[in-house]
A protein has these predicted regions:
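Flexible loop/hinge segments that line or gate small-molecule binding clefts
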Residues: 107-134, 248-254
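Short, well-structured alpha-helical segments in soluble
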Residues: 76-93, 197-217
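Short beta-strand elements at the ligand-binding edges of bilobed clamshell
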Residues: 124-148, 156-159, 253-265
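C-terminal motif of bacterial Sec signal peptides marking the signal peptidase cleavage site
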Residues: 18-19
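Hinge/cleft segment of the Venus flytrap/periplasmic-binding protein
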Residues: 270-340
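Extracytoplasmic "Venus flytrap"
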Residues: 33-54, 58, 68-75, 100
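An alpha-beta-alpha
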Residues: 55, 139-188, 283-310
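Periplasmic-binding protein-like
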Residues: 36-37, 91-100, 119, 154, ...
């Protein structure tokens, strides 16, 4: 299955570069640079990959744009690439920085020409720099609430990352606030390698007592761990059932009742569209459940092909949907009240 996902990415890249080469007079000269997060990969991570896909879709619909994709290994390399972009900035150039780790790059910058968008920042800079914040807590709380009748094993990539902490805390709070009583948490690492250890995670799931949950259909794996989640999806093909976090994860495994979609790609798509149309970007904008950028996506194949044929599986799609509707308004309140 992982091989198929990689092939999909390669096909999308082919379309992407063909689109970039198809010049048209209206967009000729427009130059877009996207710097991806350093802490995880481009494939399978739930952060960079959805942004990459949205970018390719946007550019293929707007031929004539020159696009540069940057994936620095660390913040020092990112700063060097950022300074190079600043040195050549002009009115037809835009830069999208994918992640709050890049906040130090724009501190103190007063952009004279061109434009910059910093994703996942709650700061307001002005001076030609826009920020956008995706609020994840409410959607994570909702996901935890609708899983209240299961035992959960939450696989957390690391402690101390703002986004990982927000998602994990939201799931745990939604679960416990609504009577869930079987919560386990496993922190994979003390550093960002916890977001890039799919093989090790598979071994952890196999070796630990967690595997016993799945013989009785009482447990759900919840991977909040970047591309390490691929190990959980691989495990779920052989045992039982995983929740998707980040994007629609149903292409990875059918044994997945739902995904918590955090639509970073949709945000990037909107900003690219506004830039192409020469519309201004706001100094700051918030996104989340309230804007339709965070939502539950149920996996129809799971309920049609698996749950309906397993009498031990306790919940129908209608039952899950009813729980979502029951807790959605409260989740929106949680989104609005969380200290981001």
């Amino acid at each position: 299955m992982m091989k198929g996902v990689k092939i999909e990415i390669l096909l999308l890249l082919s379309v992407f570069f063909l689109a970039c080469g198809n010049r048209n007079e209206e967009n000729s000269g427009k130059d877009l640079t996207v710097m991806f997060a350093t802490t995880t990969g481009l494939v399978g991570d739930g952060y960079n990959e959805p942004i990459l896909k949205a970018l390719m879709e946007s550019v293929s619909a707007q031929p004539g744009i020159t696009v540069h994709l940057l994936k620095p290994d660390n913040l020092s390399e990112a700063r060097s690439q950022f300074n190079d972009w600043l040195a050549g900035a002009d009115e037809r150039k835009a830069l999208i920085l994918c992640g709050p780790e890049f906040e130090p790059l724009v501190d103190g910058v007063n952009l004279k020409t061109g434009r910059i968008m910093l994703l996942d920042s709650d700061k307001t800079y002005g001076g030609g720099i826009s920020t956008a914040l995706l609020k994840r807590y409410g959607g994570a709380w909702l996901a935890g609430a609708i899983m209240k009748d299961f035992e959960l094993v939450l696989l957390k990539g690391l402690d101390g990352d703002r986004i990982i902490d927000e998602i994990s805390q939201g799931i745990e709070d939604g679960y416990s606030d609504n009577g869930g009583a079987g919560f386990q948490k496993c922190v994979l690492s003390t550093g960002y390698e916890g977001l890039n250890m799919a093989d090790e995670l598979y071994s952890i799931l196999w070796e630990q007592e967690v595997v016993k949950l799945f013989y009785s259909y009482e447990g759900l794996i919840v991977p909040v761990c970047g591309s390490s989640r691929l190990g959980a999806f691989n495990f779920s093909w052989r045992y039982y059932a995983t929740i998707g976090i980040g994007d629609d994860c149903s292409p990875y495994t059918d044994i997945l009742p739902f995904s918590l979609v955090l639509d970073l790609g949709g945000i990037v798509r909107e900003y690219v569209s506004e830039w192409v149309q020469n519309s201004s970007w706001p100094a700051h904008a918030d996104y989340g459940m309230s804007t339709g950028h965070v939502y539950i996506s149920f996996n129809g194949r799971f309920f049609q092909n698996f749950a309906s044929n397993n009498e031990s599986w306790p919940f129908s799609l209608d039952a899950w949907t009813a729980l979502e509707n029951q807790y959605k308004d409260k989740a929106l309140e949680k989104e609005a009240g969380y200290a981001y």
